[in-house]
From Swiss-Prot:
It is an enzyme of class 3 (hydrolase). Its EC number is 3.4.24.-. It holds the Pfam family Peptidase_M50. This is Putative zinc metalloprotease NMA0084. Its cofactor is Zn(2+). Disulfide bonds: none annotated. Keywords: Cell inner membrane, Cell membrane, Hydrolase, Membrane, Metal-binding, Metalloprotease, Protease, Transmembrane, Transmembrane helix, Zinc.
Length: 446
């Protein structure tokens, strides 16, 4: 229910403001608006105010603004001056562009509001490399500072991860790093076409790198877990399992995952004294029906390293909204690059998410707090704005192309050309929606 409410609220905000952008500019341009609807289908709420019918409909996958238009039915003589299709192309361009531009402006405001509460930045340093992962096979080492991905400079951990994941299935990914010793080198990830890369793309997942260094000290023990039953407490240092030394937390985590229901004899230190305990990991079924072990221990991060890579501060309100602008421009450019890679075949369609995934992320971000949810809304608003500006007929961007061509030529494009374009655009969007739903379902099924 929490996830559903977070998703519905997000759709109401983002779609309402997108359509309100169209509505406001249409009214400013003297166009009569007949209906403003959030959602598709038969409205369950209708309120008439002035010339406009305001509606809420049950399918929360979009909305629309219906204007007087001679192409969509008979228009009275009195309403002809207020018909959308009778306006100068410049006015129609302004009306159509207003929706996606409102989404981009909203993203700036949402990011700015979030940043005004405080900002935490993670520098692009590798803290931990998990064994037997894409990153480990590429030769990444703890202490590497990621400087660029395929020649694109990266300034923080999030940007570095996004660039790597988006390029993963396009071919070799050249990651420029500065090693812990200060040497400049390139780590090459060659995972295109592998099942592992496909899984990472579909789940926007984990390539085996973490910014944090994790010690072999227990940072937390879950109540009722096998670890608590065995007597473990926060601060215990794990030293050996079944007589073999534990070199890293990843080693211990891999052992427990591979040992569901099997007894493990753990050696640990507490207050300078050595203790042993028998732990039998709980058996947990994953979405793909594989069974893993879980003991309920969380690691303690290396606090000195954490202080080195993490920077927390509270910018001024002016600076916060300036950062919101920068973040919106950056994410818009990343989204455009992704669509370009998608068209050229250099990005996987597995990255496309539908409403189920968006709803899941909405719920997760809302649980993390207001800032996380605001930034989720901003990111989806950017995606909505950029997507609608693409020059695809049926989208706002496609209509912008038609009206710009009309302005240049002095007359509209032929009806046949427009119809072919609209059919092509509709087919493309139906295909994209089908892929998005397919990806959603396969993600849910693991």
């Amino acid at each position: 229910m929490h996830t559903l409410l977070a998703f519905i609220f997000a759709i109401l905000i983002l779609v309402s403001l997108h359509e309100f952008g169209h509505y406001i500019v249409a009214r400013l341009c003297g166009v009569k608006v007949v209906r403003f609807s959030v959602g598709f289908g038969k409205p369950f709420f209708t309120r008439k105010r002035g010339d406009t019918e305001w509606c809420l409909a049950p399918i929360p996958l979009g909305g629309y603004v219906k204007m007087v238009d001679t192409r969509e039915g008979e228009v009275s003589e009195a309403d002809l001056p207020y018909a959308f299709d009778k306006q100068h192309p410049a006015k129609r361009i302004a009306i159509v562009a207003a929706g996606p531009l409102t989404n981009l402006a909203l993203a700036v405001l949402l990011y700015g509001l979030s940043f005004s509460f405080g900002v935490t930045e993670l520098r692009p340093y590798v803290g931990t490399v998990e064994p037997d992962t894409i990153a480990a096979r590429a030769g990444f080492q703890s202490g590497d500072k990621i400087q660029s991905v395929n020649g694109t400079p990266v300034a923080d951990w999030g940007s570095a991860q996004t660039e790597i994941v988006l390029n993963l299935e396009a071919g070799k990914v050249a990651v420029g790093v500065q090693t812990a010793s200060g040497a400049q080198t390139v780590r090459t990830i060659d995972a295109a076409g592998t099942p592992e890369a496909g899984k990472i793309a579909k789940n926007q997942g984990y390539i085996g790198l973490m910014p944090f260094k994790i010690t072999t000290v227990a940072g937390g023990v879950e109540k009722g877990s096998p670890a608590e039953k065995a007597g473990l407490k926060p601060g215990d240092r794990l030293t050996a399992a079944d007589g073999k030394p534990i070199a890293s937390w990843q080693e211990w985590a891999n052992l427990t995952r591979q040992s569901p229901g099997k007894k493990i004899t753990l050696t640990y230190e507490r207050a300078g004294q050595t203790h042993t305990a028998d732990i039998r990991p709980d058996t947990v079924e994953q979405p793909d029906h594989t069974l893993i072990g879980r003991v309920g221990l969380r690691p303690q991060p290396d606090r000195a390293w954490d202080a080195q890579i993490r920077r927390s501060y509270r910018p001024s309100v002016v600076r916060a909204f300036g950062m919101g602008w920068e973040k919106t421009v950056s994410h818009s450019w990343t989204t455009l690059k992704f669509f370009g890679k998608l068209i050229s075949g250099n990005a996987s369609v597995s990255h496309i998410s539908g409403p189920l995934t968006i709803a899941d992320i909405a719920g997760q971000s809302a649980e993390l707090g207001l800032q996380s949810y605001l930034e989720f809304l901003a990111l989806v608003s950017i995606s909505l704005g950029v997507l609608n500006l693409l020059p695809v007929p049926v989208l706002d961007g496609g209509h912008l192309v038609f009206y710009t061509a009309e302005w240049i030529r002095g007359k509209p494009l032929g009806e046949r050309v427009q119809n072919i374009g609209l059919r092509f655009g509709l087919a493309l969007m139906m295909l994209m929606m089908a892929v998005a739903f397919f990806n959603d379902v396969t993600r849910l099924l693991g």
